[in-house]
C-alpha cells in the first residue's frame, strides 16, 4: 500500500488596491479563491518588468555573482609593474552575472544595495615565505588571511566574509606580502549577492 501525495490547496485572497485608474471601488471586500498557489507577490513590490521587478518568466533583478581566477604568477607585493602596489588582478573571469566584476582593476563594484558573500583562495609559491592577502572594502582592509608554514611549498591563504554594500562600493584583494601561484588556477576570488536591502 502506497501513500498518495496530495498538493496542498491554498485559499488565496486577492486584495483589490485602489489604483489611479479607479479599478476598485471603495469598501469592496477581498475575493477568496480556492486553488494552488503558483506565485506569491509581496505587497508594495512591482510585478511587471522594470526597476525593482521582473515580469513573469523573466530573471529577477539583482542577480549578481562573479568568479575570477589567475592563470600565471603574480609579482612580489609592491612590484606589480602597473603602478598599483599590491593589487591582485584576475585574468580569467568565469562568471560575471550582473557585470559587477571589472577585470582591468580586479575590483568588484556593487551594482545594488545588499548583503554580499565574498571568498578568496590564494596559494603561495615558495616555502619559507609568508603570503598575506587582505580583502578591501573601498580603501579599508576588512579581513586578512595568511599562509606562513615554512615547511609547506603550496599553502593557501583562504577566507570568506559577508558584507553589507551600497551601490558603488568596491571590493578587491590586495597582496600585502609574498607571491601568488596561479599557474593551475589555484588563486581565485568570488562573490555573490545574498539578498538586496
Curated annotation (Swiss-Prot):
Q: Where is this region: Necessary for interaction with CBLN3, and homotrimerization?
A: 64-197
Q: Indicate where this protein is primarily found.
A: endoplasmic reticulum
Q: Does the keyword Ligase apply?
A: no
Q: Where in the cell is it found?
A: Endoplasmic reticulum; Golgi apparatus, cis-Golgi network; Secreted; Synapse
According to the UniProt entry, where is the signal peptide?
A: 1-24
Subunit details = Heterohexamer; disulfide-linked heterotrimers. Interacts with CBLN1. May also form oligomers with CBLN2 and CBLN4.
According to its UniProt entry, the function of this protein is described as: May be involved in synaptic functions in the CNS.
Q: What is this protein called?
A: Cerebellin-3
Can you tell me which residues are glycosylated? 82
One GO location term (cellular component): Golgi apparatus
Which keywords does this Swiss-Prot/TrEMBL entry list? Disulfide bond, Endoplasmic reticulum, Glycoprotein, Golgi apparatus, Secreted, Signal, Synapse
| Tissue expression | Expressed in brain, restricted to the cerebellar cortex. Within the cerebellum, expressed in granule layers (at protein level). Also detected in postsynaptic Purkinje cell spines (at protein level).
Q: Where is the C1q domain?
A: 59-197
Q: Which domain of life is it from?
A: Eukaryota
